Amino acid sequence: TDDLYNILRTRLFEEVGSEEDVLEIIEGYKDALNEARQMQYTNYTVDELSLGIKNAYPFHPSIRDLFARFKENPGFQQTRGYIRLTRLMVKDLYTEDENGIIKAKEKYLINAYDMDLNNGELATTVRGIKSSISNAIAHDIADNGSSIAEIIDKDTGKTDMQDISKLILVSSL
């Protein structure tokens, strides 16, 4: 709900972008959305996108739908679990990595795939939602550079395979 996103904004961020910042992000996403609509990848409208970003900012609006799918999971404590998971994601995004990069500085919106499953605390939280996926995470998504997605991404120099794999994972929780 919108109340949950207000709680997250208040508890997780000292400050969030201005209304002008949000409108600028919406404009950038509109172009990508229009291109996706032309290719018939989505039927999402510009109005739906605008409202979704305004309500969920600084999170991508799709995170609401994806996380809502697993809030009924017995291993997930609904609001408390949602706050814990997003807190860990945000903490990780704002922590400098081994290369001195703060990932949050490169993001316009926080997506469901913005979780480092090589981060022990974050991985433990995700595995706690559905423990049966532990082997799949290690084999397919994140195993300190040894998973299938990490190997493919190393070859391409991008994180696309891990991002897609994490979206599928979150959808299955």
Locations of regions flagged by a protein language model:
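C-terminal helical "lid" subdomain and adjoining coupling/linker elements of P-loop NTPases
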Residues: S18-I25, A32-I164, L173
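Short alpha-helical scaffolding segments that buttress acidic/His motifs in well-ordered protein cores
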Residues: L8, F67, L167-I168
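Conserved AAA+ ATPase core "coupling" helix
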Residues: D2-F13
